[in-house]
Every structure is written in structure tokens, then in C-alpha cells.
Amino acid sequence: MALLTLFSGLFSREAKAKSATMKQFDLKDGEIQHMVIFNLPYPGGSAEATKFLKDGTRILSGIPVVRDFQAFKQVSPKNDYQYGFSMVFSNQADYTTYNEHPDHVAFVQDRWMKEVSDFLEIDFKKPF
């Protein structure tokens, strides 16, 4: 019986961990998952690339309507983009607020347009 209780507890913790991991992609109605994948003109792992990613994370995640901000580095040879940013907005109004926010506008003008060589922007809502 004790062994059954132990396994039950392990499976329960595993299910909770899986649920927490999947929760970040479980959009609610009206929420928007905003992602951008991009290239920088710097060698991977360079001080310049690291600075861009850290600055982008600090600046963009500091905008009040941004939720669940994450920065990513590409690991697959199937994709030509090196990096990614991802975030969630509660609704279209928050997404618009983000796009018009002075910190976002400044980051795009001062850093993005000068340092990003290529990008693809993706915005998703739940399909059903």
C-alpha cells in the first residue's frame, strides 16, 4: 500500500509539473500570443547578441501589459532564424497598448531597426 501511495504521489507531481509547463501556451479566449523570430548580425553567443537579448527582455517585459515574456535561442537546423521573443496579451487593447507604448517604440527605433537583419512576426489567438 505504501508503494502505491508513493507512486500515486509521484504521478500527481509529474502531472502538476506538466500542467504548469503547458499552461503558458493555454490561451484563454481573447488572449494573443505574440512571437517574433529574428536574426542578428552578430555571431551566436557574442557579447553583442547577449546584450541585445538581455536589453530586449528587460525593456519589453517591463511594459505593464506584457505577460509571460520569454527570449529564445534557436536549436534546430530546420529554421534560419537564430532567436525569438514571445509574450502574451490579455486582449487586443493590450496588444495595441504594447505596440504604441513609448518603450516599445523606442526599442524598435533605437535597437530593432538597427540590429535585426531579418524577422518574422507571428500573432495567434485560439482557433476555437
How should each PLM-predicted stretch be described?
Residues 95-100, 105-111:
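C-terminal structural segments of small proteins and small subunits
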Residues 2-82, 90-97, 123-128:
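Short S/T/G/P-rich N-terminal loop/turn motif that feeds into the first structured element of a domain
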Residues 108-123:
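Conserved short beta-strand edge segments in small beta-sheet-based binding/regulatory domains
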